[in-house]
Amino acid sequence: MSDFEKPGWGDRDEGSLRARLRPLSLPVRKVLARLKAAYRLIGSAVPHGEARVFYGYRRVQGEKTVTIGGLVKVRALARVFPNTTHGFNVLYLVSSGLPRGAVALAQAAKRKNVRVVINQNGVAYPGWYGKKFKSLNEPMAELLRIADHVFYQSEFCRMAA
């Protein structure tokens, strides 16, 4: 079996009950994500002037918590731009650490004239995620279309995205 034929991370639970139920839960999760996004932005005026940043999570992990991947960047940024869960004017998302419902949140933010900033640091590929790599890339591609600004971590990331 070649490396390309070996199961990727996304193929490991193929055939399990969880994998079979996943398509049924997707519409429910999308509705919940939209409701959650609407709640975050309901009744809040978008402030002008100083940047008020929301990173997509209620809490940004502190210094004493083990943080991995792209969310390390968020922790560093939050020291300068504290996480603001309501009344924010910038939504900053990291592609390797997207919150659930990231696309719905970004769409709702755009409707409220909130600036959407994406830190793009890679894409899924078959060797990593198996046959399901496209399903992981779809929300990232949508976020890139929505974004007002994208920080690409490398030229390769820009080309691959």
Regions found by a protein language model. Name each.
Residues 38-46, 101-112:
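Short amphipathic alpha-helices and their capping/turn segments at secondary-structure boundaries
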Residues 90-92, 106-125:
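Active-site proximal beta-strand in glycosyltransferases
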Residues 59-60, 96-99, 122-125, 157-158:
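Short, solvent-exposed loop/turn segments at secondary-structure junctions
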Residues 64-67, 129-133:
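Short, solvent-exposed loop/turn segments at secondary-structure boundaries
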Residues 145-161:
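A short, active-site helix/loop in glycosyltransferases that binds the activated sugar's phosphate group
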Residues 133-150:
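Membrane-proximal helix-turn-helix segments that form the acceptor-binding/catalytic region
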Residues 2-97:
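N-terminal pre-catalytic "stem/leader" segment of glycosyltransferase-like enzymes
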